[in-house]
Amino acid sequence: MPVTIHAVEKALFKIFNNDFLFAIPPYQRPYAWTTDQAGELLSDLLAFLGDDAQPIDDVNPYFLGSIVLIKDADSSKADIVDGQQRLTTLTILLAVLRAQVPSEYAQEITKYLYERGDVIIGTLNRYRLNLRERDEKFFREYIQDENGINGLLNLEKKQLSDSQQNIKTNAIYFNNALTELTEPQRVRLLQYLMRRCYLVVVSTPDLDSAFRIFTVLNARGLDLKLSDLLKAEVIGAIPKNQQEKYTEIWESEEEDLGRDTFQDLFAHIRMIYRK
């Protein structure tokens, strides 16, 4: 039976909706974008947005790149194979915008971050983007939930993981940059982001196909290393109930050795193996 690969271009408001329930598998690397990548993204958006007088729908669209998902056509659940850095950063940007636009816009932004639960019938909030287990609670509390950004900006210095520190640093960067804009400019940026910015969504229900696509569709973001691909292959093959355990072991060793040295280790292993 042939593997189905589906690719479609979608505006961002069609990404952060009920059609997708994104999850970052434990074998993925932690959030790694710094203010270099986040700053470039925001600068590009503002440059494309251009003249304040031009109607939003007449402004040239902006292509955000592609994301690769493991997703069945009849389900909203989508494991992110490639694109987590962009989706996480876009979520941070939306959260910061929510804190700086009028309430009627802020309420709409919340719908893009999570579907509100119902206390009467006992349903929980349904978050559009679910980070890896170790960062999930932090991300929900300080990014996705209302007033989270204010709490993050005032968060006293404490022990944060590298990925959590990157989340906080990028949120502070966006907050400072957006403060330099007028309120109408922030609203205009929000409208442009959701209506005129596009992602190509590549999805397949097949894990192997997703990883093959993953190796050739990393056009933006941090450069992948062979160890990233190997990690995805190895950890992805482990039963799901053990993936978090072995991901922690893998990342602990990578942190101890350093990313570049860890990469070199596999080159040496390969040379030994070939002998």
What are these regions (language model features)?
Residues 37, 63, 86-89, 209:
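Residue-level detector of well-ordered alpha-helical segments, enriched
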Residues 78-90, 200-204, 220:
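Conserved catalytic-core segments centered on acid/base and nucleophilic motifs
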Residues 57-60, 101-132:
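Flexible phosphate/Mg2+-sensing switch loops adjacent to catalytic phosphate-binding sites
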Residues 1-81, 199-200:
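Short alpha-helix boundary/capping and kink motifs at helix termini
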Residues 4-22, 126-152:
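Short, compositionally biased low-complexity segments
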Residues 133-275:
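Polyanionic (Asp/Glu-rich) segments that form extended negatively charged tracts
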Residues 87-103:
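Short active-site loop/helix that positions an aromatic residue
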